[in-house]
């Protein structure tokens, strides 16, 4: 199993940072391979993504959600991938965001992509723009 983990410090309070990430339909704004995320029910979401120039669809399941602290998920189709994002207040105005992704796929760029997604998310939150 391939895994990557990185963290970044976002200049915003933990509640605001968590709230922004927890709007899962907005993931494509900073996870560049995702094209669309739609809520199926409280814990299931459909998604489409564009790896290697080929559109694919799948479903992911939220397996753990601790408000203000952590969100964990796993895919239900198209291979196995799981992830967890955690939010730790560093101060009133700074939050450490840690993202860990595990996958049966072995993309050489998984570590780079995790860093990229966190950087995109940081810009989205700190700049208040709709797209990172």
Describe each region flagged by the PLM.
Residues 61-64, 70-132:
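Beta-strand/loop substructures that line and gate deep hydrophobic ligand-binding cavities in soluble
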Residues 1-44, 120:
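Hydrophobic ligand-binding cavity/cleft-lining segments
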Residues 12, 41-42, 66-68, 92:
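Residue-level signal for tight coil/turn positions that link beta-strands
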């Amino acid at each position: 199993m391939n895994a990557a983990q990185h963290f970044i410090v976002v200049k915003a309070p933990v509640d605001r940072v968590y709230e922004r990430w927890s709007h899962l339909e907005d993931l494509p704004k900073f996870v560049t391979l995702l094209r669309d995320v739609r809520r199926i029910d409280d814990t299931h979401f459909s998604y489409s993504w564009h790896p290697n120039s080929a559109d694919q669809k799948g479903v992911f399941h939220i397996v753990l959600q601790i408000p203000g602290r952590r969100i964990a998920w796993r895919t239900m189709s198209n291979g196995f991938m799981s992830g967890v994002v955690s939010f730790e207040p560093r101060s009133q105005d700074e939050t450490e965001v840690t993202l860990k992704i595990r996958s049966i796929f072995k993309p050489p760029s998984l570590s780079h992509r995790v860093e990229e997604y966190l950087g995109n998310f940081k810009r989205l939150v700190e700049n208040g723009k709709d797209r990172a």
